[in-house]
Amino acid sequence: MDEKKNTIKNKNIKVRNKIKKEKKPNNQNKKIDNTKIMANSISYYNLGNSIENTLKHINGKYNKKLEERTLQKWINDFVKFCNNKRIRTTIVEKYNGNVINSYSFEHSGVIYNFKYHKPKMDMLCDNFPTLVGYLINLKKECPQEFFENDGNDSNLSLDIKVAEQGKYNLACQLADFSMKHIDGQSDGHSVVEKFMLINDCSTIACEVPVWFWEKFLDVGISGHIDLLQIRRGCVYLLDYKPDAKRENRKTVATQLFLYASGLSFRTKIPLSKFRCAWFDQNNYYEFNPDEQNFSVKIKNKLYFRKL
């Protein structure tokens, strides 16, 4: 009888220990949820919503009791490394909630959620009116048939000189900030794009379709630019790569060079006004597509590009 009691007691101890172990992930999930709430609160506020409305929205969505002082601290801390006060003020004064315009393209069976930030586009693109026209008219002018086949020549590899910059680049910081606030079900790629489109000072669009026919190479090029920025008087094409350091530099740089060439052709903006880069949370690689010398043989044709 005593042996039976000891067996039952041991089983009860094991069950209690199992319950304690199972409770730990819940605390971790709670922490993850809180960091998600911080990122979503900042984004909702930066879309032009007031502190009061942001609190109401977040508390209702997550069934929380977020305090005003906590939200204000999050906002102030974010502004310290990405000061977008001027953009938000303009949104509140002029745009009445009409901030993000979006349209989904289905290309080769994949859905691409093209979006542009209208206030930032209006504020930053004074010198690039043809780019504005290109973005606004994509919904009706993007040729579906050009994207049905694989428009990029995977064998094309150009010798492009790329400069590596430090991890403290703002793009890396924003990617790091946004990636800390996702769960296992979220697509990190789209999370970074959405967060930068809403909160970054220079990002005007994401998942931008581009296409053209490179007549010298006799190659059709089509694809989607992850992020489009306006800064330092130039148009930046950014590609988010979760492990940027391990990427094949020639492959990524070639793709970005061709996308920049295509966007230059479509908008009539000189290639000298473009910059190309790819990045993750720790690394940022950039090059000027107009400063590249290379030769490449494709389809039995030798193509030279010299300055």
Mark where each language-model region is.
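Short, charged amphipathic recognition helices of the HTH superfamily
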Residues: 46-60
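An acidic, glycine-rich, mixed-charge low-complexity segment common to nucleic-acid enzymes
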Residues: 91-152
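Catalytic cores of nuclease domains that cleave nucleic-acid phosphodiester backbones
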Residues: 156-236
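Short Lys/Arg-enriched helix C-cap and helix-to-coil transition segments
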Residues: 4-5, 79-99
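Major-groove recognition helix of helix-turn-helix-like DNA-binding domains
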Residues: 1, 64-83
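Short, amphipathic alpha-helical "recognition" segments used to contact nucleic acids or chromatin
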Residues: 32-49
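Nucleic-acid nuclease catalytic cores
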Residues: 223, 230-295
